[in-house]
């Protein structure tokens, strides 16, 4: 046997990771096997592995390995995303260290630098995924800006444009002054933030004033109206009049609009169409022309802006404007207020709003194609609740702003004629050809749009482009649609819904059959991990400390029902201990072979039990994999390996092995081989190593998934009675304070035949012998099928034992009383953190239960 005494993941995992990277599991579209396809959510090319990636890819790899073993042509398509904003920001930071900006280099040279950076550093995250054991088809690795994916993007846009679904129009958009680009609503994060609410007084035409409340006093100078609710009697007499913007000579109308909230502030709303989405909608309804006073750099500008504020940053301008309003008597009050601060999800900068031409995609007709499919039940969701969430979003979807003011990304294939201003987009049949003259007037003076597509535009094509679309490739014919998409619920709208749109529109069918949505990985307190909080758990550090198998297994084990995961390091310790337990069990089996001399070949009760229990386990675990309930599958495997195999069968097999029973050794080997197969999708490294040592076969990943054998319910029932008898004896020893190895004598009642027929195994497991008659005084432990009675005479000083128990009982009751007093205090429950209160409740429960057990034991001895 060549397994070292102790398991060291560092000596095993890199070896297998390198082997799988060099010899990837390449799919064959002509194999004739039924396909099973997963599209890997492409991580950002800028990225390093974080816990979300680790969870996401552990689940995918478990599924792909399972299906590969089930005989499917399992295809896991990997790749990375060019991550427009994120990548551009990374490279711009590198340039800043050289004292340069992208504008110093110019677009062409800057893009050369980005590609250079991508080639040098962009493969980091895929290398890290390989270290985690990801068995993707690395021969099909894709990048959202490689040649094939670029062709798909150009073709998709050409189709959308010539079908009237892509159009260019000026609208209010989210703008990040730091990243210098527009953002979709889904790329904006809103957080409650302490701020101020200012009440300002506007002079009304003909005398009097009207007061408005705002959190953005610096935008007052862009006001185009004051709106009140049509049913608000307080302002009915002012409708149709005008009000003067403070510190200016600009007069604006007072009008009625149902969007105004009567109960917010004063009930009168300043309408600033250029700087607020709601105001923009009100302005559209009333024909108000937007006026902007904040430029794209976030600075104040415009004729309406007082000289003292021009050129100031918007936040500095806010402070200064409030001073000016106060001095001029326009500030009525200033109060603390929690504002909903909208920030860029990439850099955290508070966004601004701006109006300028952008490319848009008409989502309503596209969403309707998807909704028809979802109503037919084309796509299953796990958990099912997300289907309604997906449909609700599609039913209320707005047009998608698909252009970004970046340099890194897919440059939009649209050209503007400098003579007649016509837009030129290549037609689908010539989508790769750049136009040389204007389709409208024939002029050769064409200028290409400088904007790039939103990163999610190319990501939305992922299930198609990874298979070679728009070319009619063998992969596309064989592997579309995909089977399961595994991703986090946080990108359901950003990515999943948009892939549905692409699939139904371009292929006429769903892009995948099932969507498995998992939660976020949070810290042990349920908080999001962030560098600023200092609570980030680095998966690579965890791999170094516990092993990749342990990390994978812990994450899968915790991924129940799509809920967020609170990751406590104790779960990683649990998984590492599980790996060690399995390793030691395998060493025992291999050691048992050495020098074994067969003297008999008879199935024991334990052998029959283990084979039957394994058969049930195979059936249950297979069903859980099929239902995509990997967390429960992990728990079932854990129970089967740790409890049934290691704790019970392995121990019960020792007397038979000692007696030279070949059937028992064969059962150990065969059961272990099946357990390694069941666990392989979740813990591929350790199981591959042990399977090779056990069977001599090179690649467990290519072995067949086990089929359930026959059930032996009689053996399962009999062995369960034996287990209960042993458990009862062990509990009695613990109750009496005796060491587990202490030899005792017990009297059994109930289903005792299995014990009597397997007395040697019972004695070995319990270190107990049977009494022929029921003792008068004894500690009693009742189990569902067996009751055990253990007299204390001759084992210990009964009176001394009684004194110790009574003393402990008093201590426990005192502790329980202290907890009850603390929990009864309103101050404690109101002020103490929730986890502190829960811990105190758990202490009280445990102490009361222990006290009850001691009372019962004392009453039994008399």
Swiss-Prot record:
Transmembrane domains' residue ranges: none
Residues flagged as site, Interaction with tRNA: 570
Gene3D superfamilies: 3.30.1170.10, HUPs (3.40.50.620), Isoleucyl-tRNA Synthetase, Domain 1 (1.10.730.10), Valyl-tRNA synthetase, C-terminal domain (1.10.287.380), Valyl/Leucyl/Isoleucyl-tRNA synthetase, editing domain (3.90.740.10)
PROSITE patterns hit by this protein: AA_TRNA_LIGASE_I
EC number: 6.1.1.9
Effect ascribed to mutating residue 272 to A: Decrease in posttransfer editing activity. No change in aminoacylation activity
Known function: Catalyzes the attachment of valine to tRNA(Val). As ValRS can inadvertently accommodate and process structurally similar amino acids such as threonine, to avoid such errors, it has a 'posttransfer' editing activity that hydrolyzes mischarged Thr-tRNA(Val) in a tRNA-dependent manner.
Stated name of the protein: Valine--tRNA ligase
UniProt gene name: valS
């Amino acid at each position: 046997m060549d397994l070292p005494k102790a398991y060291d993941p560092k000596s095993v995992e890199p070896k297998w990771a390198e082997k799988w990277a060099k010899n990837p599991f390449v799919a064959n579209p002509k194999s004739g096997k039924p396909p099973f396809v997963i599209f890997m959510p492409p991580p950002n090319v800028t990225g390093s592995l974080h816990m979300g990636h680790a969870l996401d890819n552990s689940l995918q790899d478990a599924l792909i390995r399972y299906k590969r073993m089930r005989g499917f042509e399992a295809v896991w398509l990997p790749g990375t995303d060019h991550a427009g904003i994120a990548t551009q920001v990374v490279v711009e930071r590198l340039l800043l260290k050289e004292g340069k900006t992208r504008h110093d280099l110019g677009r062409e040279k800057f893009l050369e630098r980005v590609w250079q950076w991508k080639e040098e550093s962009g493969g980091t995250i895929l290398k890290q995924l390989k270290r985690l054991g990801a068995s993707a088809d690395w021969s099909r690795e894709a990048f959202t800006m490689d040649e094939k994916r670029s062709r798909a993007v150009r073709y998709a846009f050409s189709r959308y444009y010539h079908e009237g679904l892509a159009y260019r129009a000026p609208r209010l958009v989210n703008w990040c002054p730091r990243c210098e680009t527009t953002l979709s609503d889904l790329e904006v994060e809103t957080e409650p933030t302490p701020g101020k609410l200012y009440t300002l007084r506007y002079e009304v035409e003909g005398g009097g004033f009207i007061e408005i409340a705002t959190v953005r006093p610096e935008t007052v100078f862009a006001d185009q109206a004051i709106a009140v609710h049509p049913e608000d009697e307080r302002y009915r007499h002012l409708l149709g009049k005008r009000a003067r913007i403070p510190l200016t000579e600009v007069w604006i109308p007072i009008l009625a609009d149902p969007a105004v909230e009567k109960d917010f502030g004063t009930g009168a709303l300043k309408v600033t169409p250029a700087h607020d989405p709601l105001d923009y909608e009100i302005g559209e309804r009333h024909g108000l022309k937007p006026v902007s006073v904040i430029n794209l750099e976030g600075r104040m500008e415009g004729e309406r802006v007082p000289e003292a504020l021009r050129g100031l940053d918007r936040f500095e301008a806010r402070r200064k404007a409030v001073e000016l309003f106060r001095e001029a008597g326009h500030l009525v009050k200033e109060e603390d207020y929690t504002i909903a601060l909208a920030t860029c999800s990439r850099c955290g900068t508070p966004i601004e709003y701006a109006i300028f031409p952008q490319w848009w995609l008409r989502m309503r007709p596209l969403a309707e194609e998807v909704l028809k499919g979802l109503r037919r039940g084309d796509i299953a969701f796990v958990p099912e609740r997300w289907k309604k969430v997906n449909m609700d979003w599609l039913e209320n979807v707005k047009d998608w702003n698909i252009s970004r003011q970046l340099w890194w990304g897919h440059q939009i294939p649209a050209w503007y004629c400098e003579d007649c201003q016509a837009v030129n987009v290549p037609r689908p049949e010539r989508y790769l050809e750049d136009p040389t003259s204007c389709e409208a007037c024939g002029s050769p003076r064409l200028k290409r749009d400088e904007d790039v597509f939103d990163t999610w535009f190319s990501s939305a094509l992922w299930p198609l482009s990874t298979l070679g679309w728009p070319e009619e490739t063998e992969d596309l014919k064989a592997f579309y649609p995909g089977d399961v998409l595994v991703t986090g619920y946080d990108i359901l709208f950003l990515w999943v819904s948009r892939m549905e749109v692409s699939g139904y529109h371009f292929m006429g069918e769903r892009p995948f059959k099932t969507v498995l949505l998992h939660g976020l990985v949070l810290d042990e307190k349920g908080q999001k991990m962030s560098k600023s909080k200092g609570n980030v758990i680095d998966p690579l550090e965890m791999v170094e400390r516990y092993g990749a198998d342990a990390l994978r297994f812990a994450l899968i084990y915790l991924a129940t029902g799509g809920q967020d995961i609170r990751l406590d390091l104790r779960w990683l310790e649990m998984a590492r201990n599980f790996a060690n337990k399995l390793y030691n069990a395998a060493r025992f089996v291999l050691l048992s072979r050495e020098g074994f001399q067969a003297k008999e070949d008879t199935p024991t009760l334990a052998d029959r039990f283990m084979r039957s229990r394994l058969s049930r386990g195979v059936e249950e675990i297979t069903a859980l994999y099929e239902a995509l309930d990997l967390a429960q599958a992990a728990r079932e495997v854990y129970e089967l390996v740790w409890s049934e195999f290691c704790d019970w069968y392995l121990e019960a097999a020792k007397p038979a092995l000692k007696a030279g029973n070949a059937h028992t050794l064969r059962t150990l080997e065969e059961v272990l081989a099946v357990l390694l197969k069941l666990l392989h999708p979740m813990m591929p490294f350790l199981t591959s190593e042990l399977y090779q040592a056990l069977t001599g076969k090179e690649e467990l990943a290519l072995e067949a998934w086990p089929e359930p054998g026959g059930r032996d319910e009689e053996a399962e029932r009999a062995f369960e009675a034996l287990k209960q008898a042993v458990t009862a004896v062990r509990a009695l020893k613990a109750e009496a304070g005796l060491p587990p190895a202490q030899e005792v004598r017990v009297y059994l009642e109930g289903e005792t035949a299995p014990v009597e027929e397997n007395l040697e195994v019972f004695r070995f497991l319990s270190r107990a012998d049977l009494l022929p008659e029921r003792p008068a005084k004894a500690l009693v432990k009742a189990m569902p099928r067996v009751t055990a009675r253990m007299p204390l005479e001759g084992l210990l000083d009964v009176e001394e034992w009684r004194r110790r128990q009574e003393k402990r009982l008093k201590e426990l009751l005192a502790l329980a009383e202290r907890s009850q007093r603390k929990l009864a205090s309103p101050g404690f429950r109101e002020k103490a953190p929730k986890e502190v209160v829960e811990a105190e409740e758990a202490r009280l429960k445990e102490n009361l239960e222990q006290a009850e057990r001691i009372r019962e034991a004392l009453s039994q001895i008399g």
